[in-house]
Amino acid sequence: MDQEPSERPLPALSFRHVDPHAYPQGVAFLDGQFVPMSEAKLSVLDYGFLHSDATYDTVHVWEGRFFRLDLHLERFFGGLEKLRMAIPFDRDGVRRTLHDCVALSGHRAAYVEMLCTRGASPTFSRDPRDAVNRFMAFSVPFGSVADAEQMRRGLCVVISDRVRIPPASVDPAIKNYHWLDLVRGLYDAYDRGGETALLLDFDGNVAEGPGFNVFAVKDGRLATPAAGVLAGITRRTVFDLCRETGLSCEAKAVSPADLRQADEVFITSTAGGIMPVTTIDGAPVGDGTVGPLTTRLKDLYWQRHGDPLWSTPIHYPQ
């Protein structure tokens, strides 16, 4: 039988937290210091943790080069402005910080994040104006939404009935950590034998998935949802590649039926690039194999990673 609080001695108060968890190898920056990922700590009183009051952006490094870094910086600073947050760095300062995280980590292929939380209030006030905004960054090994086997055969996607948070509530242009709708959609997909999920908008059209946009190909023409979605950098890159190669690509309403009847479907994310989808709700997309246009765009996408107009080199220590 448990003792009453008045009958048992209090536990000892520790003055240093010992973290038993494992973390990926990498380097983080916070409070002016570059530290191993295992030492990158956030207060439990930070509103970023308590209220998901934060914005972030993620850029990847491939073969020692950032890909489209300026576009990610532009989106990150746009989110800061909309959320009325301020950090002690301009874009060049953030660029240098991200570079140094990668260079110190030694990663040639990396997932690199910049983020700002609302921070903590010294008095635990609920007024967000009292909080001290906190900027952080980190570099960890590159990861993909789709693994090598899924890239080869294509992903199995389930269209969840969950509705994505509408733009009237949270501007999708602000990259954020409001993922509970996406996480519930993922569990819907797992329960139905899928590997990842797509959510709907309030009109019943397809919106986006957990960290990715989606494209449908029909009769050689591409379409991607226009409303209520993050304007992903990889999504934008697909538009750029289509423009260069003369392919038709349009942002418009895409219904679940449009996806199911498409010749090809693929998803796009910084975490993986252009990734094929060959099954939706248990039924094959087209002939059930990775489509030629998806393959063509995927190959072009990775080829552009060495283009100095689209990429920035990392200067690693000798």
Model segments located where?
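Glycine- and Gly-Pro-enriched alpha-helical subdomains that act as flexible
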Residues: 198, 205-226, 231
